[in-house]
Amino acid sequence: MEEVTVYKISDRAKLPYKQTSYSAGYDLYSAYDYVIEPMNKELIKTDIILKIPNGYYGRIAPRSGLAYNYFIDVGAGVIDSDYRGNVGVLLFNFGSTQFNVCKGDRIAQIIFEKIAYPKIIEVTTLEEINITDRGNSGFGSTGLK
């Protein structure tokens, strides 16, 4: 990927920014002030529109400091290459106190990832998907420690 084009909808918008040369994610910033009550959610607008190259998408991920210190998490975090709207970040407050988001705060990070577009083929028998030794064992089946 060579470049992602960014359009700022308002003067409140900030360009995504990589804090270090080898950071995987680019910080995203709130364009407005918000209050997120405990055990609630808010859609935080960034006031940016992205043009992500075909073959890539943007994955919205939490900022570790917000998650660790304030119990703030991110949901619904996929920005497709053909999306051309205001990038919003769904923040969940799993903490016991309200969380204030101020204009200009770093709220999440976007990681640009390569994507595959496989053809989906329906089969009519279970044998056609090659059953493995693991089978349908999931959620802790390979050990908890």
UniProtKB/Swiss-Prot annotation:
Keywords: Hydrolase, Magnesium, Metal-binding, Nucleotide metabolism. It holds the Pfam family dUTPase. Its cofactor is Mg(2+). One of its GO terms (biological process) is dUTP catabolic process. Belongs to the dUTPase family. NCBIfam families: dut (TIGR00576), PRK00601.1 (NF001862). This is Deoxyuridine 5'-triphosphate nucleotidohydrolase. The gene is DUT.
